[in-house]
């Protein structure tokens, strides 16, 4: 039975880079991993495969949306450390529903029988809008993980994600494993002071603190995971949080909780006092 992870976060905060490095850390510890990009940008697996691969929606268009005509090879690319990548894709700009495409991708995974092939399945999901389609991975996930930075907009999005996780937990097994603090900068960004308080308030924890480092940014543009980059000063330090996350997730009983989110209006008042 696969361990299913749903990684969410506000767009533009390094969610896909973090997801790819978590997948890499898990794979290097012996897990067979499938990473599924659930964002219309369809670049989640770029650091793993080194290219923008064909999306599920593109493959479906080629067979006039007859799911039964597709095979795993039509939509999956294998990359770094044997990680398999799949991209849901999205409709043309200005038309259709990206969440619907995510739902279609989940259906395809079931039809292809892929849930039993992997040790870990990681959904990398757009977290700005948690509509029915984009929340679909929570129906299958053992654990949700939120990627966030130490600022109000990111925390507001994280709080909305906590609402979705809380709601889904009523009918499904999903729990929140924790928050990954990304781009942590103690010189200008306040470290994790706001995230620490938010995590305590909603009843979760910080899984790890990923430092703000130029090497991580460069790895993204190079189409590589951080693990695949040449050894340079700072690399070992940057790898630590990804390995910590992988070790935590591979425990037999990963600590997790059902979050208690803050009300939309209340969060403006509360977070304002954390500056």
UniProtKB/Swiss-Prot annotation:
The keyword Metal-binding applies. ATP binds at residues 12-17, 41, 182-183. Mg(2+) binds at residue 16. PROSITE patterns: NIFH_FRXC_1, NIFH_FRXC_2, NIFH_FRXC_3. GO terms for molecular function: 4 iron, 4 sulfur cluster binding; ATP binding; metal ion binding; oxidoreductase activity, acting on iron-sulfur proteins as donors; oxidoreductase activity, acting on the CH-CH group of donors, iron-sulfur protein as acceptor. GO terms for biological process: light-independent bacteriochlorophyll biosynthetic process; photosynthesis, dark reaction. Binds 1 [4Fe-4S] cluster per dimer. Its cofactor is [4Fe-4S] cluster. Pathway: Porphyrin-containing compound metabolism; bacteriochlorophyll biosynthesis (light-independent). Its EC number is 1.3.7.7. Homodimer. Protochlorophyllide reductase is composed of three subunits; BchL, BchN and BchB. Component of the dark-operative protochlorophyllide reductase (DPOR) that uses Mg-ATP and reduced ferredoxin to reduce ring D of protochlorophyllide (Pchlide) to form chlorophyllide a (Chlide). This reaction is light-independent. The L component serves as a unique electron donor to the NB-component of the complex, and binds Mg-ATP. This is Light-independent protochlorophyllide reductase iron-sulfur ATP-binding protein. The gene is bchL.
């Amino acid at each position: 039975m696969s361990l299913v992870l749903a990684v969410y976060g506000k767009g533009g905060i390094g969610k896909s880079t973090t997801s790819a490095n978590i997948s890499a850390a898990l794979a290097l510890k012996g897990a067979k991993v499938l990473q599924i990009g659930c964002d219309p940008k369809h670049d989640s697996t770029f650091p793993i495969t080194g290219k923008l691969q064909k999306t599920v929606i593109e493959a479906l268009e080629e067979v006039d949306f007859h799911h039964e005509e597709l095979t795993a090879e039509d939509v999956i690319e294998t990359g770094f450390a044997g990680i398999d990548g799949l991209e849901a894709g999205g409709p043309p700009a200005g038309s259709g529903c990206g969440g619907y495409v995510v739902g279609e991708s989940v259906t395809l995974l079931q039809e292809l029988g892929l849930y039993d092939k992997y040790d870990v399945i990681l959904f990398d999901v757009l977290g700005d809008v948690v509509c029915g389609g984009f929340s679909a991975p929570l129906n299958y996930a053992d654990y949700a993980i939120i990627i966030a930075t130490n600022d109000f907009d990111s925390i507001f999005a994280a709080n909305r994600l906590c609402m979705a996780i809380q709601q889904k937990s009523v009918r499904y097994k999903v729990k929140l494993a924790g928050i990954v603090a990304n781009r942590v900068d103690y010189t200008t960004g306040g470290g994790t002071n706001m995230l620490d308080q938010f995590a305590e308030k909603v009843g979760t924890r910080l899984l790890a603190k990923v430092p703000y480092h130029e090497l991580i940014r460069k790895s993204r543009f190079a189409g590589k995971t951080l693990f695949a980059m040449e050894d340079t000063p700072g690399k070992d330090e940057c790898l630590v949080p990804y390995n910590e996350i992988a070790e935590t997730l591979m425990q037999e009983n990963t600590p997790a909780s059902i979050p208690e989110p803050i009300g939309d209006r209340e969060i403006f008042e509360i977070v304002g006092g954390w500056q």
